[in-house]
Amino acid sequence: CDTATDYALAKAVGWDAKVILSVPCCQHELNRQIKNEILEPILKYGLLKERMAALITDGLRAQYLEREGYEAQILEFIDMEHTPKNILIRAVKKRHAKEDNNIEASIKRCEAALRVSPTLGRLLDGFATESANSEKDHPEKEDKEGV
């Protein structure tokens, strides 16, 4: 499945979902991409690299959701003894997406340091572009909502 969680999260954001609950299972993408000279002594061990990539993936997912106006939390929802995949991303819509230079800069620094380009970021950037183009093409929609 690889990036299925990213597509589901992007759809939820695109639909302006008020609450998003996601138990991500797909974190392989960054495992193939992640590179960092400082972390190389750790990343050379496949198991550790895989686990770090999974945590970084979910951390970035939460950051993208915050950038889009959600208050995001990452929680354990079941004991580790039952399954190692027990992370829940809970996001509640708090505001409209806006340019938050701190969140955006933080995301970009992390991506650059680890040399990763997550699918969710590209998908959400695509939605933002489509939304901006739609508003330009259909300004009457904005006028009706303002009445």
Residue ranges and their predicted role:
Residues 1-147:
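Class I S-adenosyl-L-methionine
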